[in-house]
């Protein structure tokens, strides 16, 4: 509602009237000089909408004043792990057997008597038949050729002109180790040398970077891995010492050493062999032979010391006169030992190669005292039992057959390999393989009629006597410049592998073809016939 005032003339006393109006409100009535009364009027409502809101629009925003949720975690301080294992096998299912009463014993006996003669006759025919000779089931891929898998070397040793003098495979067949030294003329007693090993099963194998390297103060001439400890290896030095290393210890690999005492060899050590202690198949001793004529047995005691437990001496006057022997070129009474091989059938029986060229059959059980004045902390005994016909020069290597108790091979400077029977002095056969020296010969661990020889002309010769007894089946060229091959070893665990070391300081690992790794039919019988025919 709006109030509207009617206009009218104001009197001179207008100001007083206004005051009266303000005080009283409405005049009692119109009159001259008085204003008209105030009246109420109802007018229409006018609305003006907001244009600003339409332009700006309405915006909504959602805000949160609550903090993020609190992260919690639960942990058990005394949790228990439970593992269930069942060790009891399932109860065996009883085999259903018919009661004995259901068998007709008399009729069964009559049937067996009736067919016995016919079955025996057929079995005899099958036994004498050769229909399936040569039949074999081949579960692996056939390897047709001999190939070189690895060419290994140690550049610092090769830079010094050192030769690979010995090779050995460890008990697992995965690691091959070599000794560096010199086998030619000269005084190498003060020359620093090395023992190196490569793990062929490593994916990151580096042929010129051995897995283990041991620096040795004197030239190493021979090496042999422990039969059961894969990282233990024994070595013989030019100085006459025998040492044992643990190749898994990179900082200080030396385990034991003989030291330079009265018991130590006075000449270079030719070969070392691990032997089980009598009565302790899990404990081993180290046997060493040298050109001073002594055969010594060492046992590791305490920390770092090899102690002499048994000793033998080869004296010319005590050798059995089984054959005519040449006089020792220097007129000495001691006979220098150059190689040794133990029988696979008698752990006390061994063959020695000598500087005089004649092999000796010896025994660790010998009790006769040696007629020598060489100093020793233990009594020295004379081990020789039998003397065989000699080579034309010193023997460098001998190897006993793993398949026949009486057969062994020898190789020497005359370039011949002799096959001997322990039952007679003359060799069963003599093969001239080279016009130069033969430094090593080894019998195959899987083929009774196969052996390998290393020559001074840089080759490795593989012989299969079942095919030919006069020429090698395979000739492997180890060195292109005909540098001598000084050593070789079959791998008894991975029988397809053969390692050979040469004068260039290189070790080559050869993969043999299938014909050298799988035994043929009647091969063992043929070896028996070879020994029996000539020895008869």
Curated annotation (Swiss-Prot):
- Residues modified as Phosphoserine are 15
Instruction: Report whether Kinase shows up as a keyword of the record.
Output: no
Q: What's one GO-annotated cellular component?
A: cytoplasmic dynein complex
Q: Where is it localised?
A: Cytoplasm; Cytoplasm, Cytoskeleton, Cilium basal body; Cytoplasm, Cytoskeleton, Cilium axoneme; Cytoplasm, Cytoskeleton, Microtubule organizing center, Centrosome
Q: What does this protein do?
A: Acts as one of several non-catalytic accessory components of the cytoplasmic dynein 2 complex (dynein-2 complex), a motor protein complex that drives the movement of cargos along microtubules within cilia and flagella in concert with the intraflagellar transport (IFT) system. DYNC2I2 plays a major role in retrograde ciliary protein trafficking and in ciliogenesis. Required also to maintain a functional transition zone.
Please state the pathology the record ties to this protein.
Answer: Short-rib thoracic dysplasia 11 with or without polydactyly: A form of short-rib thoracic dysplasia, a group of autosomal recessive ciliopathies that are characterized by a constricted thoracic cage, short ribs, shortened tubular bones, and a 'trident' appearance of the acetabular roof. Polydactyly is variably present. Non-skeletal involvement can include cleft lip/palate as well as anomalies of major organs such as the brain, eye, heart, kidneys, liver, pancreas, intestines, and genitalia.
Fill in the subunit field for this protein.
The cytoplasmic dynein 2 complex consists of two catalytic heavy chains (HCs) and a number of non-catalytic subunits presented by intermediate chains (ICs), light intermediate chains (LICs) and light chains (LCs). Among them, a heavy chain (DYNC2H1), two intermediate chains (DYNC2I2 and DYNC2I1), a light intermediate chain (DYNC2LI1), and a light chain (DYNLT2B) are unique to the cytoplasmic dynein complex 2, but a subset of the light chains are also shared by dynein-1 and dynein-2 complexes.
This chain's protein is named Cytoplasmic dynein 2 intermediate chain 2
Where does this protein come from, organism-wise?
Homo sapiens (Human)
This protein's gene is called DYNC2I2
């Amino acid at each position: 509602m709006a109030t509207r005032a009617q206009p009218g003339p104001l009197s001179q006393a207008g100001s007083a009237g206004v005051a009266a109006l303000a005080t009283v409100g409405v005049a009692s009535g119109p009159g001259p000089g008085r204003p008209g009364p105030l009246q109420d009027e109802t007018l229409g409502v006018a609305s003006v909408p907001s244009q600003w809101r339409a332009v700006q629009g309405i915006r909504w925003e959602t805000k949160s004043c609550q903090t993020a949720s609190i992260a919690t975690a639960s942990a058990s301080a005394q949790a228990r792990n439970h593992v269930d294992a069942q060790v009891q096998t399932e109860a065996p299912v009883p085999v259903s057997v018919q009661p004995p009463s259901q068998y007709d014993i008399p009729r069964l006996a009559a049937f067996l008597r009736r067919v016995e003669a016919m079955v025996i006759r057929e079995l005899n025919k099958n036994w004498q038949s050769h229909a399936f000779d040569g039949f074999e089931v081949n579960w692996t891929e056939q390897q047709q050729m001999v190939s070189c898998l690895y060419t290994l070397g140690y550049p610092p040793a090769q830079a010094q002109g050192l030769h690979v003098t010995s090779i050995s495979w460890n008990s697992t067949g995965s690691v091959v180790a070599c000794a560096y030294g010199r086998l030619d003329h000269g005084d190498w007693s003060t020359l620093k040398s090395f023992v190196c090993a490569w793990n062929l099963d490593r994916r990151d194998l580096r042929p010129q970077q051995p897995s283990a390297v041991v620096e040795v103060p004197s030239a190493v001439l021979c090496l042999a891995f422990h039969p059961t400890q894969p990282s233990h290896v024994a070595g013989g030095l030019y100085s006459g010492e025998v040492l044992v290393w643990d190749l898994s210890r990179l900082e200080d690999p030396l385990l034991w050493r003989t030291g330079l005492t009265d018991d130590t060899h006075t000449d270079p050590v030719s070969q070392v062999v691990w032997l089980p202690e009598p009565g302790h198949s899990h404990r081993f001793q180290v046997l060493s032979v040298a050109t001073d004529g002594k055969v010594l047995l060492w046992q590791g005691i305490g920390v770092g010391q090899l102690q002499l437990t048994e000793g033998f001496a080869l004296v010319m006057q005590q050798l059995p006169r089984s054959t005519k022997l040449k006089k020792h070129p220097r007129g000495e009474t001691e006979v220098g030992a150059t190689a040794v091989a133990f029988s696979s059938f008698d752990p006390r029986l061994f063959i020695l190669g000598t500087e005089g060229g004649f092999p000796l059959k010896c025994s660790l059980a010998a009790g006769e005292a040696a007629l020598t004045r060489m100093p020793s902390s233990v009594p020295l005994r004379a081990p020789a039992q039998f003397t065989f016909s000699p080579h034309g020069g010193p023997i460098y290597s001998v190897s006993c057959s793993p398949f026949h108790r009486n057969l062994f091979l020898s190789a020497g400077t005359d370039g011949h390999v002799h096959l001997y029977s322990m039952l007679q002095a003359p060799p069963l056969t003599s093969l001239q393989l080279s016009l130069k020296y033969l430094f090593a010969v080894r019998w195959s661990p899987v083929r009774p009629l196969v052996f390998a020889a290393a020559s001074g002309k840089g080759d490795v010769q593989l012989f299969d006597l079942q095919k030919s007894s006069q020429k090698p089946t395979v000739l492997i060229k180890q060195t292109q410049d005909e540098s001598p091959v000084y050593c070789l070893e079959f791998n008894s665990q991975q029988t397809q592998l053969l390692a050979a070391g040469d004068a260039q300081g290189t070790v080559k690992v050869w993969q043999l073809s299938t014909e050298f790794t799988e035994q043929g039919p009647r091969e063992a019988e043929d070896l028996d016939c070879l020994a029996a025919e000539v020895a008869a």
